[in-house]
Amino acid sequence: MSDEEIDISTALNNKTTPKKKSLKRNSNSQEGYESPEEREIVYPSVFGAIGTPMAKSDNAKEWDEWKEKERKKDKAEWKRYLRSKWDMTQGHLPLVSDSEFLKGRKEHKEYNSKARMDILDGLDEVNEGFFNCGKGAAMNIRYNDKNVSKKGAKKFVATVETAMKKAGNPTMEQMMTDDLDEDEARAEAEWERQREQRKLASRAYDAAMDEREDDAKYVPWDEYCQEMEELGKELKIGEKHYKKWLEKKMDENKVTHKFNAYQLDLKCLDEDAFSNKKSLKSVVRNVQKFYRKMREPKK
C-alpha cells in the first residue's frame, strides 16, 4: 500500500469534517474606503513624461475615451466611499428623534389627517343637505366621533333658534359683516389709543429736548452778571457797562462760538453797534483785505 492510499484511508476514517477554506476580504466595511480625492491620477501616454508641459494629443479619440473612463471611475469610487460612510453610521442613527420640535410628529400628522377627513365629511353632509334640513327638521350632530342624541340635538337647535330670534334673525351675510364691523371698529379704537399714546410720548420728548437745549444755550447776560458778582461790582451792572463788556468780550473771542452771541446782544442793545470797527462786518472786511494782500504778487 502506497503512502497516498494510507493518507486517503486516514482522511476517510477521520470523524472531523475538514474546514472549508474561504477567501477573506482584505478591507472591512467598518473601516471605510479611501477618499477619491487621495487617489493618484495616472495620465495617458499622450501627456508624455510627468512634470513636463502637457503635450498636444494627436489622437483626440484616445483623450476622450480616457476622460470618460476617469469620470466613470471617479463616480464609482465616490459612490462606494459615500456608501461606506453611510454603512458606518447607519447602526448609530436614533430610531426616535430627541429634538423637542420633532416629538410627537407622527401623532400630530395623524390628528391633522383625521381632522381633515372630518371636515371633508362634514362638507359632504352639508352639500347633500343632511346637516341642516330646515326649521323643525331632525339634525344629526357628531361630537368626538360620537353621535349626539336626538334630545341633545333638539336642545341645541332650540338654543340656536332662541339666540337668532334675539338677534332679529339675521342672515349669514349680515352676521359675517356685523362681526367684521365690530372687529374693524375695535381695531380702529385700539389704533387711535396707541396713536394718542405715541403723540403724548412725542410731546413729552420734544419738551424735554427743548428744556435741555434751553439749559445748554449760552446767555451772555448770565455770564456778565456772574462775573460782576465774583468781582464784587454788583452795583455797576447796567446797560452801558454791559455794552462795554460785550465789546471787550468780542475783541477777546473772535474765533470762538460765543462771538455770535455777543454780537446779537450788542445789536439788540444798540442798532448802531455794527458801525463800530469791532463789529462782525468790519472784522470780516479786514480779514478779506488781509488775504487779498497775501494773494497779491510780491514786487
From Swiss-Prot:
It is found in: Cytoplasm, Perinuclear region. The gene is spe-11. The keyword Iron-sulfur does not apply. Keywords: Cytoplasm, Developmental protein, Differentiation, Spermatogenesis. One of its GO terms (cellular component) is nucleus. This is Spermatocyte protein spe-11. Coiled coil: none annotated. It comes from Caenorhabditis elegans. Paternally sperm-supplied factor required for embryogenesis. Plays a role in preventing polyspermy possibly by promoting the formation of a continuous and cohesive eggshell chitin layer. Signal peptide: none annotated.
